[in-house]
Amino acid sequence: MQRAKKIAKPILQIGLPLVILAIIIFYIRRDWNQLSTYTFEWNPALLALAFGGFLLQELTYGLIWRSVLARLGSKLDLRISLRIYLASEFVRYIPGNVWHVLTRVLWVSKYGVSRPIAFASMMVELITKLAAGVFVFAVSLLFWGDLGSVRSLLYGTPIVIALGVLTIVALLVVLHPRILSAFLNTALRLLKRKPVVLTLHYSDILVVTLAWCVSWIIAGFAFYVLLLALWPYTPLIALPICIGIYAIAWDIGFVSFITPSGLGFREGAVIGLFALALPLPGALAGIIAILSRLVSTLAELLCVSIAYLSGGGQARAVQQEQQAEQGLKQEDTEQQDAVLLATDASERQSIEEGVVGD
């Protein structure tokens, strides 16, 4: 069973994105004639502006994490916090999906931040980031006005608006420190880490969530500009809709937990939501989904590479230290198993000698 799981996991991680990509390419080819009826062009200036927007969002990640650390009682220099955050993201492309977490925790501990606080800051960062994505999408539903496909699906625009309002209220409840602390310590227990006392006030959590909302607005604006670069007649009303779609698509990709960075799932969500929200041909939605992944990934790699190189060998040293710790833990486990086996053998021998003596 375990061997089957080990084989199935990489197959899913590699095969599923390829299947989704193949489906997207199929629809792009199928709808290409329909796409040719639109005014379709490449605007280099707008593409560069979109790239700059995704770069700016990458920088907000480190700034928000630094703010969370400060509110938990640990302050870092601005340049150091950006370098740690971005450089630790470099190892996210290593199989395992946990190396960037461990690297950041070990690296920040060099500057006096305890590991429980570091883990807590990352959990708060992640929860508020996901919540902000849902919040931004819920607000964007208020702009889903004259959309026949949504009406036919949900029996009227008022229901869409009500859904957005209820989602916002639910998020405000979940982000309360008592509830958030319960989620946080549950996650830490699952990671076999010590629980922490969340010292954040409700206002602190709301401020951090608001900062993430600003980050999503920046990325969503870049996403809208990307669409504008290909389809110059994109209406302005599409701006808040694009912001909401990009934010919730990132959330969907993240919580899929199957493929790295939600590869395939995020693109599928973008295409599906565009089909509901905007009168775009399927081919154009597919191109935007793939292009947004490409441009945002290039922006991320640029920021991460600069931070990683500017950090010198420190990030690599932290990785080696973490691998050494994992090796020591494995050796300790093997030694404990050997002691237990030796003890069991000794006990069995004593019992057998006693039986023979009797």
Each PLM stretch: what is its role?
Residues M1-L86, F143-F254, A277-D358:
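Predominantly cytoplasmic-facing regulatory/coupling regions of multi-pass membrane proteins
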Residues Y61, W99, A132-F143, G164:
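Membrane-embedded alpha-helical core segments of multi-pass
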Residues A70-L72, R79, H100, L106-P116, ...:
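Transmembrane-helix boundary and interhelical linker motifs in polytopic inner-membrane proteins
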Residues L82-K110:
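Extended non-transmembrane interhelical loops and adjacent amphipathic helices
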Residues A87-I94, A247-E267:
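Transmembrane alpha-helix interface/packing and boundary motifs in multi-pass membrane proteins
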Residues F90-P95, S109, F119-A138, I252, ...:
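Membrane-embedded alpha-helical segments of transport systems
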Residues L106-I117, E267-L284:
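Interfacial segments of multi-pass membrane proteins
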